[in-house]
Amino acid sequence: MLSNIGFPGLILILVAILILFGPKKLPEIGRSLGETLKEFKKSTRELTDDAFQEKEKK
């Protein structure tokens, strides 16, 4: 689905986000999105590490 979005579509989405939230809110939104992605990656890494360790114990 997202692979069909070209460069013009991406620009359109970014402009729509800018209009919706305004330039003052964008850094806050970006920061919270980054923290969310960081936490998600950390959780998935911990789950895979736990699963790998349990597999080695058996």
UniProtKB/Swiss-Prot annotation:
Pfam families: TatA_B_E (PF02416). The chain crosses the membrane at residues 1-21. Keywords: Cell membrane, Membrane, Protein transport, Translocation, Transmembrane, Transmembrane helix, Transport. InterPro entries: TatA/B/E, TatA/E. The keyword tRNA processing does not apply. The keyword Mitochondrion does not apply. It is found in: Cell membrane. Disulfide bonds: none annotated. It is a single-pass membrane protein. Belongs to the TatA/E family. Forms a complex with TatC. Part of the twin-arginine translocation (Tat) system that transports large folded proteins containing a characteristic twin-arginine motif in their signal peptide across membranes. TatA could form the protein-conducting channel of the Tat system. This is Sec-independent protein translocase protein TatA. It comes from Bacillus cytotoxicus (strain DSM 22905 / CIP 110041 / 391-98 / NVH 391-98).
